[in-house]
């Protein structure tokens, strides 16, 4: 299989390594040409994804910012083989899929929205690894929800990544859920670490601090774009969370033991309900 990858960051680089390890031919387009040259010299990439190689690709994986993915697809759609499968790896789906599904229909190739639920607090090719996706969930947004043949084709194409599970959803539901499960934790972590007390945490912090602050180390440009593209869903979760925090704040301010125990017990029971 010939695989084309757009972007050589953590996700794109890990995809390249996984497919190369599985014996496939890998072409990559990357803004940083020096990094692309390094990847080629290191054997992680076979060559550049460009006008001559795009038509050769059986699978195209788009692993840059949402607008960049759509812009590239609009510019190169006419070069893509009608037998090719194109999957994006962006953290939002409505904006991407609403523009890419019509493109695929117009030019005859197949586009499926994708979101690999794997990552790291670090970004860039130097942190990429072939095993990044091993056992991780993959969310799929197909153009037709119940096309089992297409879903099997996608699973087969992604086999070298080693995903542990596949979830199929709509673009709207994806963005609603991802605001809660991914985007909100990044906001909370990033805001929490700004406390002036954080400067003196060493010697006083353990697992809970590490868990809460891990994703504060993020890519500001990328996450800002994701938050704004998913603005309504993120604001819904933020408003709910802020209201909830105010209840804890008021109970502590009022020294209201009963209310505080009630709030904590509600949270404990909700965790048991959703993850028990």
Where would I find each of the regions flagged by the language model?
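Internal alpha-helical scaffold of NAD(P)-dependent oxidoreductase catalytic cores
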Residues: 130-214
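Interdomain hinge/lid region at the active-site interface
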Residues: 200-270
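N-terminal Rossmann-like NAD(P) cofactor-binding module of classical short-chain dehydrogenase/reductase
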Residues: 60-61, 87
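NAD(P)+-binding Rossmann beta1-loop-alpha1 motif at the extreme N-terminus of oxidoreductases
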Residues: 1-51, 55
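Short beta->alpha hinge that forms the Motif I/post-I loop of the SAM-binding pocket
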Residues: 31, 64, 89
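Short phosphate-binding/catalytic loops that engage adenosine nucleotides
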Residues: 24, 44, 109, 163-164
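Rossmann-like NAD(P)(H) cofactor-binding subdomain of soluble oxidoreductases
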Residues: 74-126
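Alpha-helix C-terminal capping/helix-to-coil transition sites in glycosyltransferase folds
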Residues: 55-56, 135
């Amino acid at each position: 299989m010939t695989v084309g990858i757009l972007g050589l960051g953590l996700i794109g680089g890990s995809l390249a390594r996984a497919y190369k390890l599985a014996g496939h031919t890998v072409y990559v387009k990357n803004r940083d040409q020096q990094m692309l040259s390094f990847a080629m010299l290191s054997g992680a990439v076979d060559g550049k994804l460009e006008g001559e190689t795009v038509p050769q690709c059986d699978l195209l994986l788009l692993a840059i910012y949402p607008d960049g993915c759509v812009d590239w697809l609009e510019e190169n759609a006419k070069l893509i083989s009608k037998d090719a499968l194109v999957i994006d790896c962006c953290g939002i789906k409505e904006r991407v899929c609403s523009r890419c599904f019509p493109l695929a229909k117009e030019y005859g190739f197949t586009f499926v929205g994708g979101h690999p639920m794997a990552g790291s607090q670090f970004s860039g090719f130097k942190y990429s690894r072939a095993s990044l996706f091993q056992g991780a969930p993959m969310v799929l947004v197909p153009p037709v929800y119940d096309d089992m043949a297409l879903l099997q084709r996608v699973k087969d194409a992604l086999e070298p990544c080693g995903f542990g599970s596949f979830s199929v959803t709509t673009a709207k539901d994806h963005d609603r859920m991802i605001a809660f499960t991914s985007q909100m934790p990044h906001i909370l972590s990033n805001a929490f670490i700004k406390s002036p007390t954080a400067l003196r945490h060493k010697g006083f912090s353990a697992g809970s601090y590490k868990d809460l602050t891990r994703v504060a180390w993020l890519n500001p440009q990328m996450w800002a774009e994701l938050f704004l593209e998913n603005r309504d869903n993120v604001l819904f979760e933020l408003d709910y969370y802020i209201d909830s925090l105010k209840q804890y704040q008021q109970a502590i301010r009022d020294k209201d033991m009963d209310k505080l125990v009630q709030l904590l017990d509600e949270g404990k029971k909700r965790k048991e309900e959703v993850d028990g």
